From Swiss-Prot:
InterPro entries found in the cross-reference section: Aldolase_TIM, DHO_dehydrogenase, DHOD_1B, Dihydroorotate_DH_1, Dihydroorotate_DH_1_2, Dihydroorotate_DH_cat, Dihydroorotate_DH_CS, Dihydroorotate_DH_I
Top-rank taxon, per record: Bacteria
Function: Catalyzes the conversion of dihydroorotate to orotate with NAD(+) as electron acceptor.
Compartments reported by the entry: Cytoplasm
Record-given protein name: Dihydroorotate dehydrogenase B (NAD(+)), catalytic subunit
Keyword check for Calcium: no
EC identifiers of the protein: 1.3.1.14
CDD domains according to UniProt: DHOD_1B_like (cd04740)
PROSITE patterns (UniProt xref): DHODEHASE_1 (PS00911), DHODEHASE_2 (PS00912)
Keyword Cytoplasm in annotation: yes
Cofactor note: Binds 1 FMN per subunit.
Quaternary structure and interacting proteins, as annotated: Heterotetramer of 2 PyrK and 2 PyrD type B subunits.
GO biological process, one term: 'de novo' pyrimidine nucleobase biosynthetic process
Length: 304
C-alpha cells in the first residue's frame, strides 16, 4: 500500500513498522507466527565481535507497565551471525537493520566493516549504550565527543548507511544527537531503555542478578515521545522512534512527535502479532485523520 511507504537511507520500507533490536531475535523465532515480508524492515539482535553468553540469571523481570532486562548482549558473535543467521533472510524481501555493539571503538569498527559488506544487510544500527572499557566504563553514548568519534569511525568503514541508537540515560540528548549528526550519521534510533531496578521485598535483594537493567514497555513511552519531539526539531536526519509502542495509535503519536518510522519492542513478547496488527490498523487511522500518506504526519505536533 503506497500510502504507508517510507523511504529512508538504506531502508526502502513498505510501511513504517519494524521490530526493535533485541526483541525479535534474528527473525526466525517470529516467522512461525506470520510472514515476515509484511514488515517494513527488521532490526536484528545485536552483533558483537566475539560470541557472548550474556549475564547471569535472572536477567528479566516484569514490571507493572513493562519489563526490565539485563540480557548482556547474548549473541553468536560476528562470524556466527554471518554464517548462521543472515543467510536465513535470503527468502525474504525486507530491509535488514543490523545492530552492532562492542567494548572498544576497534570492536565496533571491525564488526561494522565486515557486517556492512554482507548481502542481506541494508543498514547498520550503532548501539552506543555499551560501556567503553578504555574510558573507565563510561557508556559511548553519554558523552557527545565520544559518541561523535565512534560515529565518524564507523561511518568511515561502513558500506551501508549508519543509524545511531541513542541512550535516554543522559543529561542532554539533543546535544548528543546534534554531535552524532555532525559526525555523519545517516539517522537516529531512539530511545533505548531507561536504567531501572526491582527489589524483592521478601529476600531484600535485587530481582535481577545484574542488579540494574533496562526498563522498556509502556512505562517509557512518554519519555520517548518527549525526547523525539525535542531532537527531531534540532536535526535534519530521520529518526526511528521506539519506546512503549503497542498500537497503531501509538505509531501515529510517534510520527507526530517527529519520528519517520517506528520500532516495536517489548510488545512483541506479550503478543507476537503486534507488528502485523499495527500494519493492518494504520490505514484505518489515516482515513480517520483524513491523511493520504503516512509521511504527512511526521512532525505534525511541532509548533509552527
Amino acid at each position: 500500500m503506497e500510502r504507508l511507504q517510507i523511504s529512508l537511507p538504506g531502508l526502502e520500507m513498505k510501511n513504517p513498522v519494524m521490530p526493535a533490536s533485541g526483541c525479535f531475535g534474528f527473525g526466525k523465532e517470529y516467522g512461525q507466527f506470520f510472514d515476515l515480508n509484511q514488515l517494513g524492515a527488521i532490526a536484528i539482535k545485536a552483533t558483537t565481535k566475539e560470541a557472548r553468553f550474556g549475564n547471569e540469571t535472572p536477567r528479566v523481570a516484569e514490571t507493572k507497565a513493562g519489563m526490565l532486562n539485563a540480557i548482556g548482549l547474548q549473541n553468536p558473535g560476528l562470524q556466527g551471525v554471518i554464517e548462521q543467521e543472515l543467510p536465513r533472510f535470503d527468502d525474504y524481501d525486507v530491509p535488514i537493520l543490523a545492530n552492532i555493539a562492542g567494548s572498544t571503538m576497534d570492536d565496533y569498527i571491525e564488526v561494522a566493516a565486515e557486517l556492512s559488506q554482507q548481502r542481506n544487510v541494508s543498514a547498520i544500527e550503532l548501539n552506543i549504550s555499551c560501556p567503553n572499557v578504555k574510558q573507565g566504563g563510561i557508556a559511548f553514548g553519554t558523552v557527545p565527543e565520544i559518541a561523535a568519534e565512534l560515529t565518524k569511525e564507523v561511518k568511515a568503514v561502513s558500506a551501508v548507511p549508519v543509524y545511531v541508537k541513542l541512550s535516554p540515560n543522559v543529561a542532554d540528548i539533543v546535544a548528543i544527537a546534534k554531535a552524532i549528526e555532525k559526525a555523519g550519521a545517516d539517522g537516529l534510533a531512539m530511545i533505548n531503555t531507561l536504567l531501572g531496578m526491582r527489589i524483592d521485598a521478601k529476600t531484600r535483594r535485587p530481582v535481577l542478578a545484574n542488579q540494574y537493567g533496562g526498563l522498556s514497555g509502556a512505562a517509557i513511552k512518554p519519555v520517548a515521545l518527549r525526547m523525539i519531539h525535542q531532537v527531531s526539531q534540532q536535526v535534519d536526519i530521520p529518526i526511528i522512534g521506539m519506546g512503549g509502542i503497542q498500537t497503531a495509535e501509538d505509531v501515529i503519536e510517534f510520527l507526530l512527535a517527529g519520528a519517520s518510522c517506528i520500532a516495536v519492542g517489548t510488545a512483541n513478547f506479550t503478543d507476537p502479532y503486534t507488528c502485523p496488527n499495527i500494519i493492518r490498523d494504520l490505514p484505518h487511522w489515516l482515513d480517520r485523520l483524513e491523511v493520504q500518506s503516512i509521511t504527512d504526519l511526521i512532525g505534525g505536533s511541532w509548533n509552527e
